[in-house]
Design a protein with these regions (language model features):
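Short, surface-exposed interaction loops/tails
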Residues: 112-165
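Short, well-structured alpha-helical interface segments that form or flank functional binding sites
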Residues: 3, 43, 47, 86
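Extracellular/periplasmic head regions of type IV pilus-like filament subunits
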Residues: 63-134
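Aliphatic-rich helix starts adjacent to a transmembrane/signal segment
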Residues: 19, 25-50
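Charged, low-complexity surface patches
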Residues: 10, 37, 79-81
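N-terminal single-pass transmembrane signal-anchor helix
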Residues: 2-29
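N-terminal alpha-helical signal peptides/signal-anchor transmembrane segments
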Residues: 44-63
C-alpha cells in the first residue's frame, strides 16, 4: 500500500520551521527599521544645525554684539557667550528649515513639524504640556538650537535628544 501525502508530524514540523523563519525575518526587519530611523534622525539634526548656522551667519554681527552676561548657553558642559538661543520652530518660520510633515494645531492651524521617530514615549518622561508632541513620534519644534560665533565662524548646536540606542 502506497501512502500519498504527509503525516501530521511532517506538517507540524513544516509549520514550525516556517514560523521560525518568519520570526527571524521580522526581528531583522525591526532592527533594520530602527537603524534607518536613527540614521534619518541624525541627518535631520545635521540639517537643523546647518539651518541654525545659516540663520546665525545672517545675524553674525548681532550675535557678536550680544551682552555675554545675558546671552550664554551651555554646550557639552562648557559655557559659551555670547550665544543666541532659537527654537526649531523659529528656523521653520523663517524658512531656514523646511518640512513636509504637518499637523493640525489649535484645531485650525496647519502646523509644520520636524518629527523624531526614534523616541519611545514609554522610555522618556513626558511633561503634561508636551503630551501633544507625541502623536506620531516626537515633535521637536520647541527644542532649542544654540547659535554662537567663535573665531568669526558661526556654529549651531541642537539641544534635544539625539537618538535612542
Amino acid at each position: 500500500m502506497e501512502k500519498k501525502g504527509f503525516t501530521l508530524v511532517e506538517l507540524l514540523a513544516a509549520i514550525v520551521i516556517l514560523s521560525i523563519i518568519t520570526l527571524m525575518g521580522s526581528v531583522g526587519i525591526s532592527a533594520a527599521k530602527k537603524g534607518i530611523n536613527e540614521s534619518l534622525w541624525n541627518n535631520n539634526i545635521n540639517l537643523i544645525e546647518a539651518a541654525g548656522e545659516s540663520f546665525g551667519t545672517d545675524k553674525k554681527e548681532y550675535i557678536k554684539n550680544l551682552d555675554p552676561s545675558e546671552y550664554s548657553c551651555e554646550i557639552d558642559g562648557q559655557t559659551i557667550s555670547p550665544c543666541l538661543t532659537v527654537t526649531v520652530q523659529t528656523l521653520l518660520n523663517r524658512n531656514y528649515l523646511s518640512s513636509k510633515e504637518r499637523i493640525e494645531y489649535d484645531d485650525t492651524t496647519d502646523y509644520r513639524v520636524i518629527v523624531n521617530k526614534t523616541i519611545d514615549k514609554a522610555k522618556v518622561i513626558v511633561p503634561a504640556d508636551e503630551e501633544a508632541n507625541f502623536e506620531s513620534g516626537y515633535y521637536v519644534n520647541r527644542v532649542k538650537v544654540y547659535i554662537y560665533v567663535e573665531n568669526d565662524i558661526v556654529y549651531a548646536k541642537y539641544s534635544g535628544i539625539i537618538a535612542e540606542k
